[in-house]
């Protein structure tokens, strides 16, 4: 109902992004059981599409059961585009099977290019990727901020750490996480290598950042999603970000 409402308010412009999250967040933060993420996502999508059709739903899945459910409001559209967040192979395969688009995050450029080429040859969907982005007139400040953000996700996000370890950055992830366990976030960003930074982030002055964005586009991404990371003054930093990417 929330998605249908936002689609009405936005005059049919909503794209619904869905993700199953990870075991630590679901179980430790929310107190729920994390199980069967691929099957759970498959049923999410089936149920949402049935609900938007305004038909009465009687659904019996392996995860969810619904009896006599009908959406109470009249949706703007009978079909809202659904994009799925995907990291590992099973979720990537499901996404290309049932979704309108995919949302990638912290995926090395070369690996992402190979995955997009392989999957798009089977069926074309929209490809998006959220990219850690730090823009400053001082390139070194931008790079430092990006390294700290990347080190944070590697330290606390086991699913990203494991994926990156299997895809070209085994030593880096091991070292960054090891230092995090010893001293927290004090200095583990210093272990982010130039290769890792260039493969996963946009960081630099405005001209450098625009060039780096093009690398991600060239990998097959249709819609880069800029993850804003402010440097010093947030308002000024956001103004520079807009000037960099939105103004010719």
State where each predicted segment sits.
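Active-site-adjacent structural elements that line small-molecule/cofactor binding pockets in enzymes
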Residues: 1-248
């Amino acid at each position: 109902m929330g998605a249908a409402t936002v689609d009405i308010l936005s005059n049919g412009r909503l794209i619904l992004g869905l993700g199953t999250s990870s075991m630590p967040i679901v179980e430790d933060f929310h107190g729920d059981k994390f199980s069967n993420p691929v099957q759970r996502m498959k049923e999410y999508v089936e149920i949402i599409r049935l609900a938007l059709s305004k038909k009465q739903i009687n659904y019996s899945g392996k995860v969810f059961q619904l009896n006599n459910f009908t959406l109470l409001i009249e949706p703007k559209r009978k079909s809202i585009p659904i994009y799925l967040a995907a990291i590992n192979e099973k979720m990537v395969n499901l996404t290309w099977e049932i979704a309108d688009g995919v949302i990638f995050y912290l995926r090395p450029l070369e690996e992402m290019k190979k995955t997009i080429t392989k999957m798009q040859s089977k069926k074309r969907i929209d490809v998006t990727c959220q990219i850690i982005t730090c823009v400053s007139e001082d390139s070194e400040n931008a790079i430092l901020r990006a390294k700290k953000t990347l080190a944070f996700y590697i330290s606390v996000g086991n699913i990203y750490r494991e994926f990156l370890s299997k895809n070209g950055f085994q030593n880096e992830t091991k070292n960054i996480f090891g230092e995090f366990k010893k001293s927290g976030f004090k200095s583990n960003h210093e272990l982010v290598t130039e290769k890792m930074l260039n493969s996963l982030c946009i960081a630099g002055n405005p001209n450098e950042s625009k060039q780096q964005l093009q690398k991600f586009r060239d990998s097959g991404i249709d819609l880069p999603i800029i993850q804003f990371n402010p440097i010093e003054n947030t308002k000024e930093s956001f103004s520079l970000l807009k000037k960099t990417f939105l103004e010719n």
